[in-house]
Design a protein with these regions (language model features):
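Transmembrane signal-anchor helices characteristic of membrane glycosylation enzymes that use polyprenol
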Residues: 8-42, 231-248, 347-350, 425
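Perimembrane helix-loop-helix junctions
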Residues: 196-235, 320-327, 331, 395, ...
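Transmembrane alpha-helices and membrane-interface helical segments
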Residues: 110-114, 118, 157-164, 200-208, ...
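Transmembrane helical bundles and short interhelical boundary loops of multi-pass, membrane-embedded
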Residues: 403, 407-432
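Start-transfer (signal-anchor) and selected internal transmembrane alpha helices
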Residues: 1-26, 221-232, 314, 333-341, ...
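Membrane-embedded helix bundles of polyisoprenyl
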Residues: 16-19, 109-118, 123-211, 227-246, ...
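Hydrophobic, aromatic-rich transmembrane alpha-helices
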Residues: 306-335, 346, 350, 422
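Membrane-interface coil-to-helix junctions
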Residues: 19-112, 131-152, 156, 251-254, ...
């Protein structure tokens, strides 16, 4: 790594730190805090109880303060073993809460940057992808639900380490992947962990195809498999301290029953909600009596990414076919990544439709474990992930179009881009 690359990396890290600091600046500078429902009516008391037991050197198997008592460690939402939750034992809740949000926003941006960088091969374009992921409406709305917020943040890190372990197998990469998977599980949102494992398997198959099968190097993938299997076994061994009691608790819960009603209608996203990609407040605002959308509450269908990322995703769809083939006659890998995440975006959105889509019912009936989760809209996280990759590719291809040829030959690109920006910004300002 040369000096210029080191300087760029340092600036990018500083950029993510600055953006994260701006997001929590009212909490740092003015002593304010986000008074959110679940944060203060559930998570605060869970973390206070954890703090009390950590200080006394106790692993709290039982919580005597809730109803007539209930298992504590076995409840994944307690996230007792999540390392970043231990800051609540060192600081008062408001200080720890501020630091928790700051750290996770930074990690969301940096992890996505690390995932996108090998695809776009330009630091500042991958930085754009990181900013999209860390500031999208879905992630910000999940700050209320600290376990889900923390779990989502680890998604791009796991995918990045999965790719690195496959393409550059080593015991170090294998251990890092295993640790990342275990930490995401400890964060406490089982549905996000389940979706990550499900998507990770499909992503792994995609990587094997584009990097090995397509290049006729199928046998070369075999040495990587032992490192991936080792990572999975390491993660399983680590999480058993949480998984074993959670599984026992699950066997006594309503979700273990064959006739369990997941009430998926509460978080089934109506197809008209696709408009909120541009107009986040089209169906109302957060809060009681201020929202009239199809889902239970505003946050359940919140997935606004902003006008610029949306436009760059459209540009990627317009420009990808113009990217030249490589000397081997194949399209560049970035085209394969774009098409993969475009398809996965569509699948994730169809799943999020829940009861409005027959496809969801197929997943619900066929995929093991899928019927035990209540919120179909949680799959929207993969829409955000996909857009955080497609938008940087759209930006890269736009820059290539305007630099490789005479401007007059690319007038249609310039006019289209300018028109899209003008139209969407105008409508967004009026509607929002």
């Amino acid at each position: 790594m040369n000096t210029d690359e080191k300087n760029q990396n340092a600036l990018i890290i500083c950029g993510f730190i600055l953006i994260s600091a701006i997001c929590v600046s009212p909490m740092i500078l003015f002593g304010k805090t986000l008074v959110l429902r679940d944060t203060f009516f559930e998570f605060r008391f869970l973390y206070d109880f954890s703090r009390e037991n950590i200080i006394n050197g106790i692993i709290p198997l039982w919580n005597p303060y809730s109803n007539c008592g209930q298992p504590f460690i076995a409840n994944p939402q307690s996230a007792f073993f999540y390392p970043l939750n231990w800051i609540y034992a060192l600081l008062n809740f408001n200080q720890a809460y501020t630091l928790f949000i700051f750290i996770h926003l930074f990690m969301a941006g940096f992890f996505m940057h690390a995932f996108v960088r090998p695809i776009v091969k330009r630091n500042w374009i991958s930085f754009f992808g990181g900013v999209i992921f860390m500031l999208n409406g879905l992630l910000i709305s999940r700050i209320e639900f600290l376990s889900e917020f923390a779990s989502i943040v680890w998604l791009p890190a796991i995918l990045a380490l999965l790719r690195v372990t496959l393409l550059a197998p080593s015991w170090l990469n294998s251990v890092l992947l295993g640790l990342a998977m275990a930490i995401q599980f400890f964060a406490g949102h089982t549905q996000t962990f389940y979706y990550t494992a499900f998507f990770g398997l499909i992503f792994l198959i995609f990587l094997v195809f584009v990097h090995f099968v397509r290049e006729k190097k199928t046998a070369a993938v075999l040495p990587s498999m032992k490192f991936l299997i080792a990572a999975g076994l390491l993660a399983l061994l680590i999480i058993m301290v949480q998984l074993a009691p959670t599984y026992e608790l699950f066997s006594h819960s309503l979700r273990s029953q064959a006739d369990y009603d997941a009430k998926t209608h509460l978080a089934s996203v109506h197809p008209m909600h696709a408009l909120t990609f541009l107009f986040p407040y089209l169906f109302g605002w957060p809060g009681y009596k201020s929202y009239w959308g199809s889902t239970y509450e505003f946050w359940a269908s919140s997935f606004y990414v902003g006008v610029m990322p949306f436009v760059f995703c459209l540009l990627a769809a317009l420009l990808f076919y113009r990217v030249k083939k490589t000397r081997s006659g194949h399209r560049p890998l970035e085209i394969s990544y774009f098409l993969f995440f475009l398809v996965w975006f569509a699948i994730a959105f169809i799943i999020a439709l829940g009861d409005y889509s027959p496809v969801f019912r197929i997943f619900h009936a066929v995929v093991p474990g899928f019927d035990k989760f209540r919120w179909p809209s949680s799959s929207l996280v993969f829409c955000m992930l996909s857009m955080s990759i497609m938008a940087p590719l759209g930006l890269k291809w736009l820059l290539q179009e305007t630099s490789n040829r005479a401007l007059k030959k690319n007038r249609w690109v310039t006019v289209t881009f300018g028109a899209l920006i003008a139209v969407f910004v105008t409508i967004a300002v009026v509607m929002n």
